[in-house]
Structures are given as C-alpha cells and as structure tokens.
C-alpha cells in the first residue's frame, strides 16, 4: 500500500518561493521485503542504478530507473570533470522538510584514466578497450531507505519535478505525485526476472593478464624504483577476465550476500555494467564539509573468531602496514589540504580495522572544510585518483603504474559517484568491482608495494581481494568458478 507523504499545499508553498528552475520533492512511501528485490521489480530494459550503502551517507541506500538524461565522454574529447560539472549545472533543490539526503540526483562513474587530464602521464599501457572516461545519468526520482533495516523496509520514493517545466505549481505537484506512485507500484508489484546474459557457456573461469612470475616482475620493478627514490609506495594490479555468463543483476544479488560493503553499487549503463563491492570512500561533500577514508593494510579473514583476532593483531602490529598506512593518510591530508580552509584538515579516526567476508582492512577518516570559492570539481580533482590505489608521491607513481601494468585501468580505481542537486556528493573508489564490457567480465585486483614487499605475498593479497567477486559469480552460476591464474605459468 502506497502513502503520499507530501501534501499539495506544502509543495505549492515551497514552489511559490523557490527559484523557477528549482526541483521540489514529492514523497510516497511503500513497504517492501527487500530493497534489491524492489529494484529488480522496478527496473526495465534501460536498466538503472542501485547504491547499497551500509556506511557513509548516514546509512542510506538508493535506486533509480528510467534516467531523464545521460552523458558519456570519450577519452579523446578531454575535459571530463568539466563535462560532469556542466551536466550538473543549473540543477537546484528545495527540499523543505524532506530529510532524504538524495531525493533525486545523478549517478555515474569516472575512469581512472581521467588522471591523464590532471597529470602529464605517458601512454605506455595499452588502451585495449574502447571505454569512455565518464558515464553519468540524471534521475528525477529515487527510491531510498535507511540502513540497517529489519525484516521489511519502508521505501521512500521521491520524485522531484522542476517547477518551471509546468504552467502552475499544482500541475508540477500532480506530475511529481504520479511519477513517485508509478515507481512505488513497480517496486512492489513488478516482474523481478532479468533477461538472459548474451554469453551462453559452461565456463566462467577468470584468467589473468599476467602469470605469478610476471606479477613478481612488476613488484620487483617497483621495488627498484623505490630504491632509486622515485616512489615510496605503489599499487600494482593485475586484470582478470571471464565470459559474462551471468547477468550483472544476478551477480550483484549474490555479491551483496557474500560480501556486503559500505559503498557497493550496481550500474547498468549503455555498453558497460559495474558490479561493485567497494569498501572505500574517495570523497564525501556535504555543505563545506569534505572527507575521505583511506584504506591501507590488509589481512585475510580467519577461519575462526580466535584466528580473526590474531590476524587483526598481526595487522595492527605490522611495521610495514603501519608505515604504509601513515604515509597514505599523510598523502590524503595533503590532497584535501589543496581545497580546504587553512587549519581545517584533521584525522578524525585513525587505523580502525574493518572486516569483510574475505579480508580485513586498516581504515582512517580524514576531514576538512572546503575553502570559499572552491567547487565540487576542484575537490574531485584534488583527491582523484585516490592515493591508496596509486601511491606516493602520486604523479610519479602513476607514471610507474602506467609502465608496469600491461593495460589501462578503465573504471578500476576510478570512482562511482552519487551527486545531489544541492551540491552534496559521495564518490567511492572502484575496487572489488566486476566490469561487464563486450560480453566479458573484467576484474582488477591490486596490492600496495613498498621497499620490503614480498612478491608472493603481494600476489596472494590480490587473490584474496578478488575472491569475494569470484564467489559471487560462483553463487550466481550455481557452480564452481575457478580462479585460474593461480595455476598459470
């Protein structure tokens, strides 16, 4: 049963005082058993976006379907962040009493290779996939819910008509109410099935672009650069590929069960689908407050609680992990400092341990206050790409990454972003993410290399990080999926 929470008078009073181009939310509520099942019911042939947030954003999750607008930027065009700003420009939101952080907004992803527009980088890595630098869609309505949730959840469906698109505020209200009711009904009553994947195969083996030995060579090359003083730490990755034998919706449905993560997302976009279990926040902006949450330091999960505790103690006591984490926190402090008011940058949470299904991580929180005149675009440019998935110093380390990795990263270590129409934004770092492109799943996994890194240990860390994604495809297929690169020679 749907209930309309925004009355006509409240809406028209807000609209009367608002800027003509402003959007005013109309809220409808509906109870559902599971938000992702509701998304499956509501999505159509155009796909949609689902952001399963269990951390950040005060514990809110969102989904959107039927985008009102879409933009894509080719890498050869340049100006990616400016194009994103242009896409968001002109949007205003008058929220009134609506406390949903994002009642409407835009969702998109930025390629790691946007870094080539921010720094002068070589073109050593092969651009073997014709992927864009940006895909972003605008949603005039969202379904939102608060985490954690019980056995059932109340979806708060908000439609945000633009006042000047209608002859009167009353007409805008009626449109918004109907628009919200349509999504609420679809979420409660639609067909949750998805179309079959385009690939029909009994094989879903992930194969790497390098062997254990060639990955070790990458690590040794980076260690030589460290000895030469070019870098202190660098994130080195390998790319895994498998036929796209399961639909992204099915893969995400399994992934959210086997490895729930605070910045997970499913993006179904033209030509590219992202299935992400990212645990890492690149940037959150709310008013003038900005923050980032660097992750540096990893251990596998133990088989028992006692083993877990021993591994956590080992992680906290490890001098290599301690030094690497401190260095990267300092890097993020410096990045935020580029756009923050003097003296406002601080570390509010240092070296906590977060546990996930396959691994545990060291995490810190760095905060600042955006200086007067600095924009969201400035803030993104200051922190992008994240220091934890490049290294320190960042520009030189990105040059080294481009040299040692065989192919361009694409979405990996780029960002998935949720952008509000009031300047609010939340961007993750694209790690632990399946990318479906050209009937294949691509999965990149990396490890931070420092002066005393052991190549075999770093290689194993990449496998540990990729395991949850492989398990999700395994569960979706209902059979064993091999991580074949473990045995490659």
From Swiss-Prot:
Other notes: Component I catalyzes the formation of anthranilate using ammonia rather than glutamine, whereas component II provides glutamine amidotransferase activity.
Listed cofactors: Mg(2+)
GO molecular function: anthranilate synthase activity; metal ion binding
Keyword Metal-binding belongs to the record: yes
Catalytic reaction equation(s): chorismate + L-glutamine = anthranilate + pyruvate + L-glutamate + H(+)
EC id: 4.1.3.27
Ranges annotated as biased composition (Basic and acidic residues): 300-309
Gene3D superfamilies in UniProt: Anthranilate synthase (3.60.120.10)
UniProt cofactor note: Binds 1 Mg(2+) ion per subunit.
UniProt binding sites for Mg(2+): 324, 461
Pathway connected to this protein: Amino-acid biosynthesis; L-tryptophan biosynthesis; L-tryptophan from chorismate: step 1/5
One biological process term in Gene Ontology: L-tryptophan biosynthetic process
SUPFAM superfamilies noted in UniProt: ADC synthase
Annotated L-tryptophan binding sites: 262-264
Any Pfam family hit: Anth_synt_I_N
Chain sites annotated for binding chorismate: 297-298, 412, 432, 446-448
Subunit: Tetramer of two components I and two components II.
Region annotated Disordered, chain positions: 288-309
Protein name: Anthranilate synthase component 1 1
Keywords from the UniProt entry: Amino-acid biosynthesis, Aromatic amino acid biosynthesis, Lyase, Magnesium, Metal-binding, Tryptophan biosynthesis
The family this protein is said to belong to: Belongs to the anthranilate synthase component I family.
């Amino acid at each position: 049963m749907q209930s309309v929470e925004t009355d006509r008078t409240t809406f028209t009073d807000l609209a009367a005082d608002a800027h003509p181009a402003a959007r005013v939310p109309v809220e409808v509520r509906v109870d559902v058993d599971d938000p992702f099942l509701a998304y499956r019911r509501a999505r159509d042939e155009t796909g949609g976006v689902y952001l399963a947030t269990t951390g950040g954003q005060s514990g809110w999750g969102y989904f959107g379907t039927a985008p009102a607008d879409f933009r894509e930027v080719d890498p050869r065009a340049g100006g990616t962040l400016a194009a994103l700003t242009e896409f968001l420009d002109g949007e205003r939101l008058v929220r009134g009493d609506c406390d949903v952080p994002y009642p409407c907004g835009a969702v998109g992803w930025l390629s790691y290779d946007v870094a080539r527009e921010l720094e002068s980088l070589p073109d050593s890595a092969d651009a073997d996939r014709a992927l864009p630098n940006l895909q972003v869609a605008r949603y005039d309505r969202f379904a939102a819910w608060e985490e954690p949730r019980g056995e059932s959840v109340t979806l708060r469906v908000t439609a945000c008509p633009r006042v000047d698109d209608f002859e009167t505020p009353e007409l805008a209200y009626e449109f918004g109410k109907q628009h919200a009711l349509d999504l609420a009904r679809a979420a409660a009553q639609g067909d949750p099935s998805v179309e079959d994947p385009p690939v029909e195969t009994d094989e879903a083996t992930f194969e790497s672009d390098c062997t254990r030995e060639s990955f070790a060579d990458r690590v040794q090359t980076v260690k030589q650069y460290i000895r030469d003083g070019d870098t202190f730490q660098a994130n080195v990755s390998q790319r895994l590929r498998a036929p796209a034998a399961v639909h992204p919706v099915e893969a995400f449905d399994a992934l959210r069960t086997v490895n729930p993560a605070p910045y997970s997302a499913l993006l179904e976009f033209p030509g590219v689908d992202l299935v992400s279990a990212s645990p890492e926040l690149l940037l959150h902006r709310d008013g003038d407050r900005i923050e980032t949450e660097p992750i540096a330091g990893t251990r596998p999960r133990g088989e028992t609680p006692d083993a877990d505790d021993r591994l956590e103690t080992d992680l906290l006591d490890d001098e290599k992990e301690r030094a690497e984490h401190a260095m990267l926190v300092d890097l993020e402090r410096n990045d935020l400092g580029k756009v923050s008011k003097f003296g406002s940058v601080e570390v509010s949470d240092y070296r906590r341990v977060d546990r996930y299904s396959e691994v545990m991580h060291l995490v810190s929180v760095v905060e600042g206050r955006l200086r007067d005149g600095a924009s969201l675009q400035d803030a993104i440019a200051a922190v992008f790409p994240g220091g934890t998935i490049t290294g320190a110093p960042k520009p030189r380390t990105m040059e080294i990454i481009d040299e040692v990795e065989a192919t361009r990263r694409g979405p990996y270590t780029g960002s998935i972003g949720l952008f509000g129409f009031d300047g609010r934004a939340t961007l993750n770092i694209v790690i632990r993410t399946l990318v479906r492109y050209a009937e294949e799943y691509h999965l990149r996994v990396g490890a931070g290399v420092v002066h005393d890194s052991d190549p075999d240990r770093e290689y194993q860390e990449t496998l540990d990080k990729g395991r949850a994604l492989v398990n999700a495809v395994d569960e979706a297929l209902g059979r064993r999926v091999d991580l074949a690169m473990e045995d490659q020679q």
